[in-house]
Amino acid sequence: MTTPAVTQRDSTADADGGAVPVLGLRANWRQFWLLVLVNAFVGAMVGLERTVLPLIAEREFGLASKSAALSFIATFGVVKALTNFLAGRLGDRFGRKRVLVAGWLVGVPVPLLVIWAPSWSWIVFANVLLGVNQGLAWSTTVIMKIDLVGSKQRGLAMGLNEFAGYLAVAISAYATGEIASRVGLRPEPFYLGVAFAVLGLALSQLLVRDTMTHVRHEAASAAPDGRRAARTPRARELFALVSWRDPALFSASQAGLVNNLNDGLAWGLFPLFFAAAGLSLREIGLLAFIYPATWGVAQIWTGGLSDRLGRKWLIAAGMALQGLALVAMVAVRGVAPWLLTGALLGVGTAMVYPTLLAAIGDVAHPSWRGTAVGIYRLWRDLGYAVGALAAGLLADAFGMAAAIAAIGVVTVASGLFVAVRMPETLPAR
């Protein structure tokens, strides 16, 4: 198919004078970068908690058990995982923008609940709402960018999306750590969250446009092949396809789950691990910053790199690097070595994160892509719950260092599975 010339901002005229969407980052750059900004605010919402909330659990609510202290992450992960699936399905049925705005409406009360919480149950409930917010809003910004750019720049688009989200996670985590070191764990660090939620909601409602016309255009022009069936499967068929039947989608789903198992570990256990080593709040904030910051920045290159080199081996190598970084983290001591291992963990995650999303987009037909992304993200974000529970139970039984090392070994095994089982998904040029 010949790409039509761009005569409008993001569409051109067809033979009948109607508007035909043009796929590509350049043709849709205004909406694309607006969605990047929106996703930065989504990421900043979860970054609020990464430095201070595990410490609030211990110091303000007296939760000595690591599994109890990490319960908020498990709750967040389960809710976000289920909401991811709903977001994809609802977006395919009712349009992307409505789902995005709904996600922000649910997110507005989150920082207020944390500020006012008289008991730990309030924190857990706030993370139920945060899981819904992240599942609806982050999933939808991912799907909308895939809609806009088409197949040729899918990896780059996912890299830029995740760059914005996780750099914002890092900056928010560092900022809350700095504020907490000066004035306390609550309420001041969470005032930032009120601003993030209001700005994200305003941009989504007032400036973001829906992308369903791009979806219909791509679906009409997509040539079906063995894996990209033009018939839209039922939800049950799609769930089985993504979860275990298709080797590429299954490989991506298990790697995504283990990847976020690591992130759940880092979110919940790293601040406690570093605090037990005698580090200050400012140093803990710096270490909470370096992992998602490296992850976020490196995705600018790794997403586009997968468009050139392919998906499979970047995913396998990234999982192996993450696992080795976790094992190394418990073998060293001191802020500088931990900064290095945190950066290596971030690079490994950056190799994997946007590439997995791009691989899902490679395999899924445009007509059911949103649902496929939602199912993949369901499995991926269940990793938060699995990671929090596994890390907490292992830490209570064997110590925090043993928990971190054990999850590192699991991560290397996941990378080996990808190397053996996953076919290359990048379309032939």
How should each PLM-predicted stretch be described?
Residues D10-W29, D210-A252:
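Juxtamembrane intracellular "pre-TM" segments in multi-pass secondary transporters
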Residues A27-L55, R245-L265:
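Pair of pore-lining "gating" transmembrane helices in MFS-fold secondary transporters
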Residues V52-K66, G268-E283:
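Short amphipathic helix-loop junctions that connect adjacent transmembrane helices
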Residues G77-F85, A170, P292-I300, Y384-A385:
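Residue-level signature of mid-helix packing/kink "hotspots" within the transmembrane helices
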Residues T83-G95, A180, A298-G310, A395:
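Helix-to-loop junctions at the C-terminal end of transmembrane segments
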Residues R98-L112, W313-A328:
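Structural signature of the two symmetry-related core transmembrane helices
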Residues V128-Y166, A358-A359:
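Cytoplasmic helix-loop-helix junction between adjacent transmembrane helices
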Residues E188-Q205, I404-A419:
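Symmetry-related core transmembrane helices of the 12-TM Major Facilitator Superfamily/SLC fold
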